[in-house]
């Protein structure tokens, strides 16, 4: 029997998906992009739309199961929210959209709001948050909308099971979906209502098994989604959000860790947990109680309810890690005379001018801006006295258009001589490049401030035999790592002494903290 074409093969709400994807790039709070930078991250609206449209058939296809048509009619057909456009807002002529099941399904994926439609017809713009209607699958706010996600999951459930059994009715499929979904909710309630469930008693193990059985039973009747090049994890994440059993793989270890952090661990550990006050204090101590107060979580009748265990623990242990590391290396980052703590130090490597009569130590700067935005422009203005190069900090547009380091060649601001890229690399290979502390960026009550160095920063002693120093040799293929050819042959050489000292302290304290976490916490 010929199968119906999938919706993605026939039609997609491209304009709507594009609009929400542009918005997706600017969302920060709660977005997986804030976990770790990944250079080829796919927009979540695109992934959600593509996965959904790949799993459901075109309802106007002759081979589409009747149960799926009935599902659209029941779930979307009577809701004016999913009514097709009376006049498609992005076409140049009057263009009414037929009210049929396919278009209803497209409007469920993404539909411009009435305000946006009116503005588009008038040639006006609309704020990104207000472009799509509430209740659309791809809208950011729908990520945790139980009603919207339930519709999407039931449609996928119906499409998947009706394809295998074309004679089954939507009523029967709807009832089986509701029963399977309710079984998961009941199993979750039974498990997450238990007090001190991190202690693995026989009762807790039984309830954990019951929950896993309910989830497996549900997902056995849903399609599986596999992304062999998962990268930032957007496709596995959205497949899981739609109720499917999702699989992701990537050969890059950074991608693998990102996928663990964005897809696997939140699903496994990001659940509610209840503690007795005694057990909570035993695990978290006074610092944990302080965090409870800061988050507005109260102790009620000796019971503490944490809405999301993983979120709480990440914040708690992150504060512990930062406090331990700051205690050890904080003296390397002293506050200024006004008590403002540094956010960052701006250093530059310096090379020696190749002119024998000059020999100035020139910072390898490609540009002079410390801040260059539409609202704030701060730059370094060179002050040259003979072969001595210093800087002052000024606000406004920098009059110097190009830096002294251009395509690797260094132009000396003292004598005008050019030190070629080859000569600069030779100095680097012979360890002749030095470091110059140029500016400090501090956090004040008025925001970021930029200051000239007012202190001599101590360079810490580094034990290069320390187990936390990466002494491994780098690959010799220069096309894989851009630092090759500069005398950088081992990974630790990518960092300054200060950076190495801070990083080794960070890793050491992380290991200490990791060993303090009980095996029952995150098995």
Regions found by a protein language model. Give the residues of each.
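S-adenosyl-L-methionine-dependent nucleic acid methyltransferase catalytic domains
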Residues: 1-523
């Amino acid at each position: 029997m010929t199968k119906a074409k999938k919706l993605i093969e026939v039609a997609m709400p491209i304009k709507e998906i594009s609009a929400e994807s542009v918005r997706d790039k600017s969302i920060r709070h709660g977005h997986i992009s804030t976990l770790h930078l990944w250079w080829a991250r796919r927009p979540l609206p695109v992934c959600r739309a593509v996965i959904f449209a790949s799993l459901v058939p075109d309802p106007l296809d002759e081979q589409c199961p009747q149960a799926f048509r009935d599902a659209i009619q029941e779930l979307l057909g009577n809701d004016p929210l999913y009514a097709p456009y009376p006049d498609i807002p992005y076409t140049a002529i009057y263009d009414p959209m037929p009210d049929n099941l396919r278009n209803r399904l497209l409007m469920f994926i993404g539909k411009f709001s009435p305000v946006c439609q009116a503005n588009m017809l008038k040639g006006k713009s609309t704020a990104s948050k207000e472009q799509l209607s509430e209740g659309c699958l791809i809208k950011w706010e729908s990520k945790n909308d139980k009603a919207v996600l339930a519709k999407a999951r039931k449609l996928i459930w119906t499409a998947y099971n009706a394809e295998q059994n074309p004679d089954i009715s939507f009523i029967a499929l709807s009832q089986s979906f509701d029963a399977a979904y309710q079984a998961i909710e009941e199993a979750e309630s039974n498990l997450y209502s238990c007090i001190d469930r991190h202690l693995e008693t026989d009762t807790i193990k039984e309830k954990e098994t019951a929950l896993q059985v309910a989830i497996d039973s549900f997902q056995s009747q849903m399609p599986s989604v596999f992304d062999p090049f998962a990268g930032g994890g957007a496709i596995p994440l959205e497949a899981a959000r739609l109720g499917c059993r999702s699989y992701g793989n990537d050969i890059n270890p950074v991608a693998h860790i990102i996928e663990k952090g964005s897809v696997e661990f939140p699903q496994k550990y990001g659940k509610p947990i209840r503690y007795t006050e005694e057990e909570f204090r035993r695990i978290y101590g006074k610092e944990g109680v302080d965090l409870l107060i800061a988050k507005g979580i109260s102790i009620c009748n000796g019971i503490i309810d944490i809405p999301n265990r993983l979120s709480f623990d990440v914040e708690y242990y992150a504060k512990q890690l930062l406090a331990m590391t700051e205690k050890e290396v904080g003296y390397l980052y002293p506050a200024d005379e006004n008590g403002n703590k540094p956010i960052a130090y701006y250093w530059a490597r310096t090379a020696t001018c190749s002119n024998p009569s000059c020999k100035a130590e020139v910072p390898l700067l490609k540009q002079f801006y410390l801040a260059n935005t539409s609202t704030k422009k701060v730059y370094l203005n060179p002050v040259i006295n003979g072969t001595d190069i210093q800087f002052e900090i000024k606000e406004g547009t920098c009059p110097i258009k190009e830096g002294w380091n251009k395509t690797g060649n260094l132009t000396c601001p003292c004598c005008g001589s050019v030190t070629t890229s080859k000569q600069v690399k030779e100095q680097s290979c012979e360890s002749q490049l030095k470091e110059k502390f140029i500016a400090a960026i501090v956090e004040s009550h008025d925001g970021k401030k930029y200051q000239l160095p007012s202190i001599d920063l101590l360079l810490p002693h580094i034990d290069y035999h320390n187990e936390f120093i990466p002494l491994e040799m780098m690959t010799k293929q220069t096309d894989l790592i851009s630092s090759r050819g500069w005398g950088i042959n081992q990974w630790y050489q990518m960092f300054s002494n200060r950076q190495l000292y801070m990083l080794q302290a960070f890793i050491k304290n992380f290991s200490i903290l990791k060993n303090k976490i009980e095996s029952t916490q995150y098995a």
